[in-house]
């Protein structure tokens, strides 16, 4: 499922100017796919469900490279941060385990209630980049 979602994002999507070097956004319905292409790994993150009606918030994640192995446990190198700076660890990774050069899956977090004005996902130590940040405004 996540593979199809990420593939659909690129089909007919219009790029939005990047706010920082190596980061870009692509509109996908209500949410934007954020892309970080620093170093040797391209990382994309797209919110899937971020509303008060769900018990879990899900983010589709894509990791693509041709030069390094993707050995990270994404539940250990990722964190969700709300607009007040509260940090939430993922409760699950739905996708292939560590290894390989192309990984797609879904990071799952417990829903934040009440919903914050903004959230960001930070993913650390992928492809030699200490930290990659992906942010969205919710309200």
Where are these regions (language model features)?
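Short linear motifs in intrinsically disordered
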Residues: 21-25, 66-72, 110-114
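Generic structural motif
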Residues: 48-50, 64-66, 112-114, 126, ...
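Short coil/turn motifs at beta-sheet boundaries
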Residues: 36-38, 52-54, 71, 100, ...
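Short, solvent-exposed, Trp/other aromatic-anchored flexible loops in extracytoplasmic proteins
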Residues: 84-137
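Short beta-strand/loop motifs in extracellular/secreted proteins, especially
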Residues: 41, 76-78, 117-119
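Membrane engagement elements in two modes
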Residues: 1-44
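Mid-length scaffold segments of soluble, non-membrane domains
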Residues: 44-92, 103
């Amino acid at each position: 499922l996540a593979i199809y979602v990420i593939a659909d994002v690129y089909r007919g999507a219009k790029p939005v100017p990047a706010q920082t070097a190596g980061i870009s956004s692509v509109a996908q319905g209500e949410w934007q796919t954020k892309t970080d292409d620093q170093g040797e790994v391209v990382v994309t993150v797209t919110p899937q469900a971020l509303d008060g009606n769900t018990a879990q918030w899900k983010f589709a994640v894509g990791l693509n490279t041709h030069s390094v192995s993707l050995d990270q446990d994404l539940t250990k190198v990722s964190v969700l941060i709300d607009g007040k700076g509260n940090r939430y660890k993922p409760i699950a990774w739905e996708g292939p385990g560590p290894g390989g050069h192309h990984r797609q899956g879904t990071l799952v977090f417990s829903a934040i209630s009440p919903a914050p004005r903004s959230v960001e996902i930070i993913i650390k130590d992928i492809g030699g980049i200490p930290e990659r940040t992906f942010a969205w405004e919710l309200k």
